[in-house]
Amino acid sequence: MLEHALIAGAFSFCIGISGLITSRNMVRAPMCLESIFNAVNVNSVVSSNTLDAEEIKGEIFAIFVIAIAAAEAAIGLSIALAIYRNRKSTRVD
């Protein structure tokens, strides 16, 4: 179970990094960043449950990351919307 979850987290992290590097769209980039954050959350929760099942440090860390990612997504999409209104495009050039 541990290996499968860590491999899935690493795969999601790699997809997010490659999407973030190759993305030229202001809507796709935050989605790739969310994928990276979710991969970190998966690895944190799995590692926390494996190493010390009685402590919930990994789960608490994941909740904080989710809260920060939600705020980042809201701010990022509002900035993208404002730029779209001015430039009529969401491409990053």
From Swiss-Prot:
Q: What is its EC number?
A: 7.1.1.-
Describe its partners and assembly state.
NDH is composed of at least 16 different subunits, 5 of which are encoded in the nucleus.
A Pfam family this chain is assigned to: Oxidored_q2
Q: Which keywords, in A-to-Z order, does the entry hold?
A: Chloroplast, Membrane, NAD, NADP, Plastid, Plastoquinone, Quinone, Thylakoid, Translocase, Transmembrane, Transmembrane helix, Transport
Q: Is Transmembrane among this UniProt entry's keywords?
A: yes
Q: Which residues form the signal peptide?
A: none
Protein name according to UniProt: NAD(P)H-quinone oxidoreductase subunit 4L, chloroplastic
Could you tell me the membrane topology recorded for this protein?
A: Multi-pass membrane protein
> What's this protein's function?
NDH shuttles electrons from NAD(P)H:plastoquinone, via FMN and iron-sulfur (Fe-S) centers, to quinones in the photosynthetic chain and possibly in a chloroplast respiratory chain. The immediate electron acceptor for the enzyme in this species is believed to be plastoquinone. Couples the redox reaction to proton translocation, and thus conserves the redox energy in a proton gradient.
Which cell locations does it reside in?
A: Plastid, Chloroplast thylakoid membrane
Q: Cite a GO CC annotation.
A: NADH dehydrogenase complex
**GO BP annotations listed:** ATP synthesis coupled electron transport; photosynthesis, light reaction
Q: Which domain of life is it from?
A: Eukaryota
Q: Does the keyword Transferase apply?
A: no
NCBIfam families, per this entry?
Answer: PRK05715.1-2
Gene Ontology molecular-function annotations: oxidoreductase activity, acting on NAD(P)H, quinone or similar compound as acceptor; quinone binding
InterPro entries from the xrefs? NADH_UbQ_OxRdtase_chain4L/K, NUOK/Mnh_C1-like
